[in-house]
Amino acid sequence: SLESITVTAYQYRDNSLYVQASRGFMPDGNVVPQVAAPGVQIRIPLLNGLYGNASGTSLSAAQTAGAAALLFEWAVIRGNQPYFTGSSVKNYITRGAEREERMQYPNRDWGFGRMDLYHTFELLA
C-alpha cells in the first residue's frame, strides 16, 4: 500500500548490505526498499537469560517499526501533528535517511538511504 514502508538490512559496523536481502524496484516503478536499517549480527535475547546474534530483514523491520512508533508518539500523543498518518511516517523516515555522496538515490539497493532517526527528528524541529 502507499502507506507501508519497506526496509532492507545492512551491517551497521561497515555499512554493507545484507547479502540475503532482496533488491530492486517494483514493476510499477515504486521504490523498494525505501530505507535500510541495521539487520546483520544484531544482539538478541534468547531463552534462559542468554543472548545471541541474529541477522535478517525482520530485525530491520522491527527497528523501523520502533522508529514509526516514536514518530507517532511525537506527532499524535504529544500533539505536534494530530493527523499524522502512515504516509507521514514513510515521508519523514525517507527524508531523514542518511545518504552517501557518491551514490544516486533512490536506488535498488539502499532505497533512499540508511534510516537515521536522529536526523529525521532534526527535520521536525
Regions from the PLM with identified roles:
Residues 27, 59, 69, 114-116:
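Short, flexible micro-motifs
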Residues 9-62:
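Catalytic-core environment of secreted peptidases
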Residues 39-105:
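Hydrolase catalytic cores
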Residues 1-3, 14, 23-32, 74-92:
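Subtilisin-like serine protease catalytic core
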Residues 35, 67, 111:
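Divalent metal-coordination and catalytic microenvironments
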Residues 31, 63, 73, 118-120:
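Residue-level recognition of conserved structural "scaffold" positions that shape functional pockets
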Residues 105-125:
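C-terminal domain-closing interface element
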